From Swiss-Prot:
The protein's name in its UniProt record: Transmembrane 9 superfamily member 4
Subunit description: Interacts with ATP6V1H in colon cancer cells.
Lineage: Eukaryota, Metazoa, Chordata, Craniata, Vertebrata
Ranges that cross the membrane: 282-302, 347-367, 377-397, 417-437, 450-470, 502-522, 536-556, 571-591, 599-619
Native source organism of the sequence: Homo sapiens (Human)
Biological process, per Gene Ontology: cell adhesion; phagocytosis; positive regulation of protein exit from endoplasmic reticulum; positive regulation of protein localization to cell surface; protein localization to membrane; regulation of intracellular pH; response to hypoxia; vacuolar proton-transporting V-type ATPase complex assembly
Gene name of the record: TM9SF4
């Protein structure tokens, strides 16, 4: 068994690997070279809000539309994310300035919003919706300049520039609602080095926007769709009254700036984290947890187990040794098959399926092969990998089921292929019905749902059956001791051996090893933030695997010392105890970080959180179970049994 020092070289290797790969970026698309005055298309992605968790497509609001609306063909991940990428009427030319242009205005007439349209726009503004646009596949960002005091005299301040994804649809002030009806686009380009006789080409490397609200009376528009912006602050914002019709102009301006940023580094603006030190603190905290558990394991194995096994193997004092060491007393029952072996093996098979999928996704993303420029690639890859990993889940479930004296392999394979995926599909279908009712773009379209079902029954199910068949035919795990025909009576257990107490005790340390990273993951999921520190995430995942394995071994050792041989289900449940703390943290995050008050957004949050907790429990429970199973087989194989 590995000690704390055994993990040191591996930790150093992973640290170096993470440092080398955290900034590594493999583009998902080829660069586009623009010439002077080439059109740069501005597309809309969706509207999002952390208060409602319901995305909407861009033209669900009365924005100006082009003569022909064209939606981009999307992959599975984009559809599941609620993206609906569509063209817009913004006319942007490479390196060509525009001071002010009016959208969808005919003969110098403003746009009139009906009462229903005004009510809808006002509702979206009060719900704090953001608009997401892209130019050359780069998402638009709003620059935020934050000032922090460096000295106690408050004279020196440091400017911290951060970027907010998308731009706010509008704002409220003293019970009045205002719409951002003017967009100042700032696009940065990098001039490519060319031969002397060749024309210069440009590449877009950043896309910013400054949203403004300008009242109709303060904008001067002419018949050529040009307009004049008010100077300085001599203007009032455009109010939206939800109880009546509103007239306004939709306008925009374009400004170009040359940048030293190269095309390969253009995503750094969105992916660079200002709180990397917090991630390092998380890693150090996690390593300390692993070393602490390694120390406990070393003490158990070196001092206790080695001494117990040596004493037990002495032929002249077997009876006395058995009386003083509880874990050896249950050698005839420790491998007795548990209740419901089919369900246990099915859940563990799904856990193996999840483990393989997550490990590959994080590793591939860490290498930069799932770049954010390939929209939806991460989710698409995860879905397909989970289906194809069914062969490994089926194989492990089939072999374990046979080890537990199971005989109905076809039923077991069906249970493995449908139990966990069926629960996930059922919850998602119910939540999707509510999303459909809100006419959100986050609702999975019916054809996509049919396609997912076809992939489930056409790919995942056959692969699970195939793996289960070969796993069931393979030689079962060789248990080192025989099982007695008559079960041994289990003595009364102390209060701290209670299953729920065990879950609380076993879950706290693995959760402590990853809770800081969990905060950033929650921010990415629920607050529409980018997360691309997969180097950190990969290292945290490895530490989570090690800590779950270690705590599982410790818990099963103390259970066997208490002469309780019913460790199969208990260890699976206890090893997934960190999922309980994930649930507690999710509730804390909902109460303290999110401003969700309506029923359907709350239902969506806790519905998806339930899926996350269930999946995390399967993952950590499976890791801990197999670590404990290997440990139990190892220690009983070292004991001589007559």
């Amino acid at each position: 068994m590995a000690t704390a020092m055994d993990w040191l070289p591996w930790s150093l290797l992973l640290f170096s690997l993470m440092c080398e790969t955290s900034a590594f970026y493999v583009p998902g698309v080829a660069p586009i070279n623009f010439h002077q005055n080439d059109p740069v298309e501005i597309k809309a992605v969706k509207l999002t809000s952390s208060r409602t968790q319901l995305p909407y497509e861009y033209y669900s609001l009365p924005f100006c539309q082009p003569s022909k609306i064209t939606y981009k063909a999307e992959n599975l991940g984009e559809v599941l994310r609620g993206d609906r990428i569509v063209n817009t009427p913004f006319q942007v030319l490479m390196n060509s300035e525009k001071k002010c242009e009016v959208l969808c205005s005919q003969s110098n007439k403003p746009v009139t919003l009906t009462v229903e349209q005004s009510r809808l726009v006002a509702e979206r503004i009060t719900e704090d919706y953001y608009v997401h646009l892209i130019a050359d596949n780069l998402p638009v960002a709003t620059r935020l300049e934050l000032y922090s005091n460096r000295d106690s005299d408050d004279k020196k301040k440091e400017k911290d520039v951060q970027f907010e994804h998308g731009y706010r649809l509008g704002f409220t002030d003293v019970n009045k609602i205002y719409l951002h009806n003017h967009l100042s686009f700032i696009l940065y380009y990098h001039r490519e080095d060319m031969e002397e006789d060749q024309e210069h080409t440009y590449r877009v490397v950043r896309f910013e926007v400054i949203p403004q609200s300008i009242r109709l009376e303060d904008l001067k528009a002419d018949e050529k769709s040009s307009c004049t912006l008010p100077e300085g602050t001599n203007s009032s914002p455009q109010e939206i009254d939800p109880t009546k019709e509103n007239q306004l102009y939709f306008t925009y301006s374009v400004h170009w700036e040359e940048s030293d940023i190269k095309w390969a580094s253009r995503w750094d603006t969105y992916l660079t984290m200002s709180d990397v030190q917090i991630h390092w603190f998380s890693i150090i905290n996690s390593v300390v947890v692993v070393f602490f558990l390694s120390g406990i394991l070393s003490m158990i194995i070196i001092r206790t187990l080695r001494k117990d096994i040596a004493n037990y193997n002495k032929e002249d004092d077997i009876e006395d040794t058995m009386e003083e060491s509880g874990w050896k007393l249950v050698h005839g029952d420790v491998f007795r098959p548990p209740q419901y072996p089919m369900i246990l093996s099915s859940l563990l098979g799904s856990g193996i399926q999840l483990f393989c999928m997550i490990l590959i996704v994080i590793f591939v993303a860490m290498l930069g092969m799932l770049s954010p420029s390939s929209r939806g690639a991460l989710m698409t890859t995860a879905c397909f990998l989970f289906m194809f990993m069914g062969v490994f889940g089926g194989f492990s479930a089939g072999r374990l089921y046979r080890t537990l004296k199971g005989h109905r392999w076809k039923k077991g394979a069906f249970c493995t292929a449908t139990l966990y995926p069926g629960v996930v599909f059922g919850i998602c279908f119910v939540l999707n019905c509510f999303i459909w009712g809100k006419h959100s773009s986050g609702a999975v379209p019916f054809p996509t749902m049919v396609a997912l079902l076809c992939m489930w029954f056409g790919i995942s199910l056959p692969l699970v059956y195939l793996g289960y068949y070969f796993g069931f035919r393979k030689q079962p795990y060789d248990n080192p001791v025989r099982t007695n025909q008559i079960p041994r009576q289990i003595p009364e257990q102390r209060w701290y051996m209670n299953r729920f107490v065990g879950i609380l005790m076993a879950g706290i340390l693995p959760f402590g090893a990853m809770f800081i990273e969990l905060f950033f993951i929650f921010s990415a999921i629920w607050e529409n933030q980018f997360y691309y520190l997969f180097g950190f995430l990969f290292l945290v995942f490895i530490i989570l695997v090690v800590s779950c394995s270690q705590i599982s071994i410790v818990m099963v050792y103390f259970q066997l010392c208490a002469e309780d041989y019913r460790w199969w289900w208990r260890n699976f449940l206890v090893s997934g105890g960190s999922a309980f703390y994930v649930l507690v943290y999710a509730i804390f995050y909902f109460v303290n970080k999110l401003d969700i008050v309506e029923f359907i957004p709350s239902l969506l949050y806790f519905g998806y959180t339930a899926l996350m907790v269930l999946s995390f429990w399967l993952l950590t429970g499976t890791i801990g179970f197999y670590a404990a199973y290997m440990f139990v087989r190892k220690i009983y194989a070292a004991v001589k049994i007559d």
